[in-house]
Amino acid sequence: MNRFTLYLFGFLLLAQANVLACNFKIANFGSPKENIKLDNNLPEPLLMPDRFGGENLIIPMEDLCKIDKSLYGTAVIYLYIENKLTRIQLYRPNMEDSKLMDYAMSKYGFFNLPEGMPKTSWRGSYIWESGNDMIEYIRTDIHEGYAEIIDITSKLYSAGMADYNAKVGEWLDSQQ
């Protein structure tokens, strides 16, 4: 009986942890932006079309994760190409921490940093595969600071993402 009680307690503890965890993946890849449903008390998410054929739906993490505050200050950007969710990006600029790196390592797997280098000084990227998803963690310098980024894309929509990235690259090359 004690073993059963212990298992039941462990299961309830794990179930509670999943309820409290933040779920920013509120839509499936390939679904239209109209499928995004938020709490009625929240303001409408910001929808920004871009010159490359995409639309970015931007939602602050605070609107998605009421209980888990560890990623507050992060923007969640849903990229729609031809009204299909193609990429989910977590963008965290100029924070004095490495919370997206910690999140990525705990969720997708650990990767080694150069010995003796603090996490906040490291710049680079790391890629994981999880089922049909490609996950890339990026820490890079930006104008007046740095940013942490997690890009999640589906292999099923990689051709559309490659075309989109090619358009962005051409435009960036023309700006030099």
Feature locations, PLM:
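Residue-level detector of intrinsically disordered/flexible regions characterized by low predicted structural confidence
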Residues: F4, L57, D68-K69
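Mid-chain, structured segments of secreted extracytoplasmic proteins
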Residues: M61-Y103
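N-terminal signal peptide c-region/cleavage motif recognized by signal peptidases
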Residues: L14-A17
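Bacterial N-terminal signal peptides that target proteins for export
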Residues: M1-Y7
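Non-cytosolic coordination micro-motifs
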Residues: L20-I58, R87-Q176
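Sterically constrained small-residue positions within well-ordered secondary structures
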Residues: L12, K69, L79-I81, M117-K119, ...
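Cleavable N-terminal signal peptides
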Residues: Y7-F9, V19
